[in-house]
C-alpha cells in the first residue's frame, strides 16, 4: 500500500532552495536578500557576483540551487525565472566567552542564519 505522496509546498510554476547554518546574523543576511528580491535571475546572479558583502557568495550558491531545482525537478524555463521571495530567519547562536577585568566573563554571541529563496516562472512581461 504505502504512503501517499506529499503535496507540493509551492505552486506549479515555482521552485525553492534553502541554505541553513549560514555564519552571519539575519540582519546582515537580509541586506543581501533584499538586493535580489523581485529581480530576474540573470540580474540577481550578476548583482551577487559583484557584491562586496562576504555572505553574498553563500546567497549566490543558494540561488543557483533554486534555479537548478526549477530546471531539473519542475521543468521550468530558466530564462523566465524571477526571484519571487528571498527571506531569512534566525538559527542557533553559538555562545563563546572572553575573560574581562576583575574576574568577570564577557559573552560573545556568534549567530547563525538560514535563507530561503523562491523562484517563479513568469511570462515575457517581467
UniProtKB/Swiss-Prot annotation:
<dbReference type="Pfam" id="PF00237">
    <property type="entry name" value="Ribosomal_L22"/>
</dbReference>
<dbReference type="GO" id="GO:0019843">
    <property type="term" value="F:rRNA binding"/>
</dbReference>
<dbReference type="GO" id="GO:0006412">
    <property type="term" value="P:translation"/>
</dbReference>
<dbReference type="GO" id="GO:0022625">
    <property type="term" value="C:cytosolic large ribosomal subunit"/>
</dbReference>
<comment type="function">
    <text>This protein binds specifically to 23S rRNA; its binding is stimulated by other ribosomal proteins, e.g. L4, L17, and L20. It is important during the early stages of 50S assembly. It makes multiple contacts with different domains of the 23S rRNA in the assembled 50S subunit and ribosome.</text>
</comment>
<protein>
    <recommendedName>
        <fullName>Large ribosomal subunit protein uL22</fullName>
    </recommendedName>
</protein>
<dbReference type="GO" id="GO:0003735">
    <property type="term" value="F:structural constituent of ribosome"/>
</dbReference>
<keyword id="KW-0689">Ribosomal protein</keyword>
<keyword id="KW-0694">RNA-binding</keyword>
<comment type="function">
    <text>The globular domain of the protein is located near the polypeptide exit tunnel on the outside of the subunit, while an extended beta-hairpin is found that lines the wall of the exit tunnel in the center of the 70S ribosome.</text>
</comment>
<keyword id="KW-0687">Ribonucleoprotein</keyword>
<dbReference type="InterPro" id="IPR036394">
    <property type="entry name" value="Ribosomal_uL22_sf"/>
</dbReference>
<dbReference type="InterPro" id="IPR001063">
    <property type="entry name" value="Ribosomal_uL22"/>
</dbReference>
<comment type="similarity">
    <text>Belongs to the universal ribosomal protein uL22 family.</text>
</comment>
<dbReference type="InterPro" id="IPR047867">
    <property type="entry name" value="Ribosomal_uL22_bac/org-type"/>
</dbReference>
<keyword id="KW-0699">rRNA-binding</keyword>
<comment type="subunit">
    <text>Part of the 50S ribosomal subunit.</text>
</comment>
<dbReference type="InterPro" id="IPR005727">
    <property type="entry name" value="Ribosomal_uL22_bac/chlpt-type"/>
</dbReference>
